[in-house]
C-alpha cells in the first residue's frame, strides 16, 4: 500500500465532524482525480487552490513502505497545523475571504494539497488569491517539521494531472508545447521563448535557468527545461500551470498551445568523480600509494610483533617453564625415568667438541662475516649448531630453505618464507588479484599502477621486517644505567656481539639449480645483518660451492668455515652402542641381586658391528637407522644388508630410471651415472680429470658431474688450491650399494648395453664426419701434396673408430645373450 493510499493519515473528517472533508472512500477516489481520470474539473463559480508545505516533502523517500500509526499522526495536517480547510476558515474570519472549500485532494508525495472551492462570482479569482496570500504572509503557517518555511497558496490556472504513480518531484520541470486543438499535429504548437516562459513561471518562485531545446533537435513535441531554485517552487509551478492554454493573445498561436509539465530528474554534475575517472594515470598510482601506506602503518607493527614473538618464542607454550616442568614430570612417569635417545649423540658431540667451541667463540667476536658449516646431508650440521653450540642462546632464528625453495609459484614461496620467520598476517593470494588489476589498468592507461608486487619485492619486505624485529630484540638488552649508555645504537651493537641474536639458515643452496633468486636475496639480507652488527648469521649447507653464491653478497670478506665429515669407525660404534643402551640404562637392577646387563653386554651378535660399520660408513643418519633396526631385534649384518639394498633401490630410482617422472630437470644421462657407479664399485675414489676423459663424458661431462654432486650420488673433493681432484660416493653406504648393483648381471648388462649403444653412435658419427671430409678432398683436381697428411689423419681416425665400433658390437652381442638367458 502506498502512502497516499493510507487512509488513516488523511481521514481528516474524523478529526472534526463539522469540516467539509470527504469520507475515507471519497478521499481514496480523489487520489487519481475525479472518477480516477487523473484530472480535477472546476465548474462555474468554482476554482482550485494548491497549498504547499502541507506534508513533509522528504516523506517521498519512503514511499511504498508500510508506515507506523504514530507517523500517521505526526505528519497529519491536524497535528502540524497545516490543514488547508482550517487556514481557509481563519482567512474567511479575519479577511472576509468569500469562498467555501468543497473538496480537498492531498498530494503527500508533493507535500501539498488541492482545494476545490466555490465563490459567489462577484470577486475574481485573482483577488481571492491575493487576499489568501496576504493572510498567509501576515500570519504564516509553519509546520513543526519545517519551522523555516511557511505555507503558500496559488490558484490553479491549468488543468492539473493528479496521477498516483511513483514519480518523485524534482527542481527541474520539462515544459512540452502541445497544440491547443485535439488531433492537431504537434508541429502546429508554438515554441514559447525564454521571455514568455519567464513571464508565466516566475511568479511561482525563483528560476535558476531556462534551457531551450536545441534548434537541430528532432524530438517532438518541442520542449524546454525550467530549473527552479528549490523543489517546493517547482511543485507549485507544476501543479498550477500543467494544462494551461496559452492563448493567441499571449503568444500561443491561433489555436493556442497547451503547456504539459512533468518533473525531470536533473543529472547533477559530479566534478570530482568525473576528474577522477578521466585521470586514471594520476589517480591509480595515488590510490596504490595510499593503500601501500595504510598497509604499512597498520600491518607492519603487527608483523614485527609476530616476528619478535617467533624469535623469542613468547607465544610458544612448549617453551614455558611450567609447561616444561609438567611435561618432564609426566614423561618420567610414562617412560619410567628412561634416558632420552638423544643421549646417544653424546659420543658424536664429544668427538666434535672442538667444532662446537669454535662456533661459540666466533659468536663472541665482532667480525662481520658469515659462519658456514658445510657437510654432507645427514652429517648432523643442524644438531651441532642449534642443539649444541646455541643450546644456551634463546635468541635464535632458524630458517629452513628447503620448503621455501621447493614451493611452486610466487604465492607458496612467499607463504613459506613468511612462515619461516613468523611474518603474519601475509596476504600472498592478493598478489594474483592485484596482478590482474595491474594488468587491466595498464591496458587502460598504458602504464603500470604499482598494485602488484614481484616475488623479489615481497621477499624483501619479509626480510626487512625481520631485520627490524632482530634489531629491536638486540637492543632490548640495553639499559640506561650501562657504562656505555651514551653510545649510539649501531655503536652499542658493534661493541656487544654477545647480545646479538643468531640467524641460522639451514639447507642453504638446496636445489639451487632450479632458481637462485631466493638464495640471492637471502644472502644479501644476511650480509646486511652482519655488516650492520644486528645479528650473527650461520649458514648450514651441503653444497661445497657455497662460496660462489655468498661471495656475491660479501665480496670482501673471508668466511669462517667448519667442514663436517663422517664419523670415525670408533665413534660410529660408540654411537650405535650408546643408542642401544639408552632405553634400559636407568632400569632397576634384577630382584635376584644379579648384575644388570645392558643390551651391548648380553647381545653376542654385536661382534659384527665392526665389519658392518666398515660397510655402512660413518654417516650419522645411516648409523641411527642401523641402531634402530638392531634395537628391533635384527642382527647387525641383516640390518646393514637391508640398508644397502634400500640404498641400491634408491640409487636406481633417483639416478638411473625415472627420468620422465623428473620433468626433464636432470642434466645427466643414465649412462653417465651408471659409468660412475660401475667405476666406484671397483675403487673407493676416482681421479676427477681421468673420469672426464671417458668417451661417455666427452659432451657436457663436467656439468653432469656437478649435477650428480648436487644430487648427492657422488662427492667431489677439491685440493688445497680449490681444483677438483677426487670423486667419491655421495654417502659411505653408497660404495657398498654400488658394489651390490654391479653384481646384478642383468642390470649391469642392460646398462652396459645402453652405454655401448651410445658409444657406437658417437663413433659412427665420427666415421660419417671423416667420410664426408674425405669425399670432399677427393673432388679436388690434381690432388695437392698438402692434403696428403690430412687424408692420412682422417683414414687413421676412421680406422680407429671402426675398430671401436666392431669391439662395441662384439660386447653388445655378449650382453644380449646375458639378458636373454638370465632372470
UniProtKB/Swiss-Prot annotation:
What is the protein name for this chain? Mitochondrial escape protein 2
Q: Which residues lie on this side of the membrane: Mitochondrial intermembrane?
A: 303-823
Main role?
Answer: Plays a role in maintaining the mitochondrial genome and in controlling the mtDNA escape. Involved in the regulation of mtDNA nucleotide structure and number. May have a dispensable role in early maturation of pre-rRNA.
Where does the sequence pass through the membrane?
Answer: 282-302
Tell me which GO cellular component terms the UniProt record holds.
mitochondrial inner membrane
RRM domain location: 174-266
Species the sequence originates in: Phaeosphaeria nodorum (strain SN15 / ATCC MYA-4574 / FGSC 10173) (Glume blotch fungus)
- Pfam family name, one: RRM_1
Which biological process annotations from GO are given for this protein? mitochondrial genome maintenance; mRNA processing
A molecular function GO annotation: RNA binding
Family recorded in the similarity comment:
Belongs to the YME2 family.
Location of the protein in the cell: Mitochondrion inner membrane
Entry keyword set: Membrane, Mitochondrion, Mitochondrion inner membrane, mRNA processing, RNA-binding, Transit peptide, Transmembrane, Transmembrane helix
Its membrane topology, per UniProt?
A: Single-pass membrane protein
Q: What is its main location?
A: mitochondrion
Amino acid at each position: 500500500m502506498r502512502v497516499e493510499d493510507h487512509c488513516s493519515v488523511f481521514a481528516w473528517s474524523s478529526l472534526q465532524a463539522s469540516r467539509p472533508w470527504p469520507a475515507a472512500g471519497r478521499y481514496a477516489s480523489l487520489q487519481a482525480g475525479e472518477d480516477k481520470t487523473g484530472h480535477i474539473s472546476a465548474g462555474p463559480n468554482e476554482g482550485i487552490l494548491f497549498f504547499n508545505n502541507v506534508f513533509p516533502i522528504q516523506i517521498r523517500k519512503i514511499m511504498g513502505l508500510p508506515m507506523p500509526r504514530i507517523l500517521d499522526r505526526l505528519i497529519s495536517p491536524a497535528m502540524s497545523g497545516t490543514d488547508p480547510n482550517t487556514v481557509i476558515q481563519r482567512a474567511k474570519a479575519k479577511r472576509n475571504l468569500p469562498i467555501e472549500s468543497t473538496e480537498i485532494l492531498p498530494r503527500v508525495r508533493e507535500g501539498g494539497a488541492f482545494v476545490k472551492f466555490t465563490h459567489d462570482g462577484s470577486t475574481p479569482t485573482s483577488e481571492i488569491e491575493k487576499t489568501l496570500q496576504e493572510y498567509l504572509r501576515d500570519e504564516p503557517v509553519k509546520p513543526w517539521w519545517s519551522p523555516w518555511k511557511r505555507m503558500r497558496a496559488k490558484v490553479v490556472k491549468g488543468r492539473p494531472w493528479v496521477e498516483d504513480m511513483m514519480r518523485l518531484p524534482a527542481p527541474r520541470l520539462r515544459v512540452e508545447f502541445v497544440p491547443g486543438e485535439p488531433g492537431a499535429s504537434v508541429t502546429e504548437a508554438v515554441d514559447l521563448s525564454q521571455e514568455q516562459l519567464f513571464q508565466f513561471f516566475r511568479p511561482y518562485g525563483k528560476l535558476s535557468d531556462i534551457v531551450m531545446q536545441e534548434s537541430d533537435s528532432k524530438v517532438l513535441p518541442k520542449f524546454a527545461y525550467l530549473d527552479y531554485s528549490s523543489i517546493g517552487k517547482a511543485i507549485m509551478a507544476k501543479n498550477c500551470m500543467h494544462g494551461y492554454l496559452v492563448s493567441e493573445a499571449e503568444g500561443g498561436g491561433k489555436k493556442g498551445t497547451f503547456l504539459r509539465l512533468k518533473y525531470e530528474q536533473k543529472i547533477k554534475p559530479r566534478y570530482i568523480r568525473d576528474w577522477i575517472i578521466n585521470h586514471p594515470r594520476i589517480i591509480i598510482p595515488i590510490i596504490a600509494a595510499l593503500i601501500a601506506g595504510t598497509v604499512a602503518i597498520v600491518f607492519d607493527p603487527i608483523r614485527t610483533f609476530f616476528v619478535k614473538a617467533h624469535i623469542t618464542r613468547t607465544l610458544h607454550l612448549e617453551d614455558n617453564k611450567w609447561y616444561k616442568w609438567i611435561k618432564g614430570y609426566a614423561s618420567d612417569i610414562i617412560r619410567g625415568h628412561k634416558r632420552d635417545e638423544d643421549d646417544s649423540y653424546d659420543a658424536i658431540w664429544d668427538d666434535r667438541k672442538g667444532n662446537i667451541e669454535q662456533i661459540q667463540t666466533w659468536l663472541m667476536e665482532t667480525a662481520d662475516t658469515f659462519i658456514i658449516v658445510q657437510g654432507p646431508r645427514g652429517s648432523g650440521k643442524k644438531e651441532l649448531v642449534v642443539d649444541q653450540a646455541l643450546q644456551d642462546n634463546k635468541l635464535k632464528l632458524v630458517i629452513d630453505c628447503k620448503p621455501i625453495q621447493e614451493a611452486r609459484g610466487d604465492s607458496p614461496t612467499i607463504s613459506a618464507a613468511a612462515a619461516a620467520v613468523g611474518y603474519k598476517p601475509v596476504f600472498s593470494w592478493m598478489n594474483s588479484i592485484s596482478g590482474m588489476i595491474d594488468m587491466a589498468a595498464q591496458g587502460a592507461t598504458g602504464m603500470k599502477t604499482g598494485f602488484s608486487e614481484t616475488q623479489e619485492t615481497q621477499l624483501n619486505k619479509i626480510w626487512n621486517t625481520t631485520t627490524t624485529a632482530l634489531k629491536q630484540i638486540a637492543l632490548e638488552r640495553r639499559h640506561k644505567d650501562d657504562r656505555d649508555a651514551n653510545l649510539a645504537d649501531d655503536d652499542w651493537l658493534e661493541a656487544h656481539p654477545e647480545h646479538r641474536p643468531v640467524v641460522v639458515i639451514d639447507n642453504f643452496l638446496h636445489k639451487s639449480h632450479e632458481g637462485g633468486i631466493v638464495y640471492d636475496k637471502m644472502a644479501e639480507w644476511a650480509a646486511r645483518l652482519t655488516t650492520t652488527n644486528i645479528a650473527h648469521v650461520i649458514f648450514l649447507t651441503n653444497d661445497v660451492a657455497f662460496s660462489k653464491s655468498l661471495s656475491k653478497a660479501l665480496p670482501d670478506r673471508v668466511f669462517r668455515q667448519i667442514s663436517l665429515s663422517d664419523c670415525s669407525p670408533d665413534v660410529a660404534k660408540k654411537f650405535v652402542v650408546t643408542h642401544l643402551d639408552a632405553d634400559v640404562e636407568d632400569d632397576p637392577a634384577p630382584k635376584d641381586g644379579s648384575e644388570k646387563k645392558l643390551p651391548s653386554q648380553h647381545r653376542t651378535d654385536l661382534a659384527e658391528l665392526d665389519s658392518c660399520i666398515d660397510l655402512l660408513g660413518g654417516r650419522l643418519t645411516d648409523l641411527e637407522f642401523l641402531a634402530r633396526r638392531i634395537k628391533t631385534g635384527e642382527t647387525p649384518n641383516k640390518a646393514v644388508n637391508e640398508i644397502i639394498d634400500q640404498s641400491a633401490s634408491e640409487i636406481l630410482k633417483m639416478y638411473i630410471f625415472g627420468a620422465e617422472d623428473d620433468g626433464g630437470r636432470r642434466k645427466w644421462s643414465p649412462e653417465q651415472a651408471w659409468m660412475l657407479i660401475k667405476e666406484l664399485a671397483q675403487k673407493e675414489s676416482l681421479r676427477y680429470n681421468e673420469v672426464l676423459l671417458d668417451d661417455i663424458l666427452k659432451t657436457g661431462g663436467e656439468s653432469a658431474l656437478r649435477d650428480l654432486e648436487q644430487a648427492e650420488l657422488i662427492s667431489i673433493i677439491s685440493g688445497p688450491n680449490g681444483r677438483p681432484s677426487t670423486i667419491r660416493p655421495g654417502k659411505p653406504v653408497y660404495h657398498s650399494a654400488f658394489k651390490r648393483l654391479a653384481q646384478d648381471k642383468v642390470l649391469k648388462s642392460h646398462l652396459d648395453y645402453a652405454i655401448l649403444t651410445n658409444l657406437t653412435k658417437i663413433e659412427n658419427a665420427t666415421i660419417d664426419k671423416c667420410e664426408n671430409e674425405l669425399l670432399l678432398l677427393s673432388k679436388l683436381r690434381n690432388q695437392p701434396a698438402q692434403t696428403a697428411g690430412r687424408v692420412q689423419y682422417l683414414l687413421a681416425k676412421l680406422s680407429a673408430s671402426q675398430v671401436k665400433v666392431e669391439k662395441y658390437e662384439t660386447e653388445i652381442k655378449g650382453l644380449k645373450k646375458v639378458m636373454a638367458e638370465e632372470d
